[in-house]
Amino acid sequence: MGQIIIDGGARLQGTVTVGGAKNAALKEMVAAILVPGRHQLNNVPDIADVALMGELLSHIGCRLQREGTTLWIVSPERLNPEAPLELVRKMRASIVVLGPLLARCGEARVALPGGDDLGARPIDMHLEGLQQMGASFRLSHGVLEGEAVNGLAGAEIELSFPSVGATENLMLAGVAAKGETIIVNAAREPEIVDLARHLNAMGASVTGEGTPMLHVIGTPNLSPAEHTVIPDRLEAGTYAIAGAITGGDVTVTGCSPTLLRMELSKLEDAGCQVRKGEDWLRIEGPERPQPIDFVTLPYPGFHTDLHPQMVALLTVASGTSIVTENLYDSRFRYVGELARMGADISIESQHAVIRGKRELSGCPVLAPDIRAGAALVLAGLRAEGTTVVGDVYHIDRGYNGLVDKLRAMGAAIARSD
């Protein structure tokens, strides 16, 4: 499964460039299902999840070609409306093929999704919304079988929670449905906004992106388009925290600091000096961070996918911090690994109480998911001695060249496969 070996104590200095946003690229790849022809995406990250989505699209009938960060997807006239378990179980984002397949083919067979096991991730909102649009479902041996005998029709759908995945699925279905779909309490994430831009470039009519109410008007004459994926704010945030935890001086380029307002504000509260421009940010970390409290919330709140990295930072703060996780009930599974390194963290329901210590100690740990794996690497950068992070295939799902980028900024880090 591979290991990352870190000799801690180096202060990171230098510049790192981030790639395209994983959480935008995956859904924009799926948009190719909607219409036959050759689609082009630029700034696509070279990560395992993108490769997995490519395998899924190939199974459905698409042909893919990649050159650098540019990806071409050729969608055929006839699709195989099936997403098999061996692909879907590895990545929860694959559930978003459900809506487009129903819209394009009138049927879909999708195994239930996997990916990072972060507790209860019901897809009820996806199904309820698609049912309001005319779909019907049944579950057979772990495979969700959907039909839209008369096609999908627009509807007003109110989400009980601003789910990113449900919003995306209903957007993708809505652009190929008949009539207007209104999504109330829609997710507002930047990746939703970017997906709307991509769909509009294909000839769709999506308005209200970035607000709680999305209007999607079905368009019969969609066509392939070229689109450039937005920068990955989670990769940018991870490197910013890497600079902070090492007391370093790190400049992140190719990013959008405006998409990290809450997270950068919390880094400032922790004692970091933050400077930023239109497409760059610079973090100068303190010798020891100040304790802070934060709560994870849907955008524009603090992103749950930067929670573990920030907790790693707070394990060496000069006091006690409290972190509240409101989105995923199993997000704290990594805490036991940080405790092996000497962190003092106690969990009470969805709250973590972090009592900062002056230093951590390197030891063998296992990455339980993408962001927790990144957090353990950051902890290893700060720890005394050697840290060995196992199960790094999780990290590969969301980061391209993490080891090389950290080494270029002075980290004593290597990978063993």
Regions found by a protein language model. Give the residues of each.
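Short, structured segments at the rim of ligand-binding sites
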Residues: 1-417
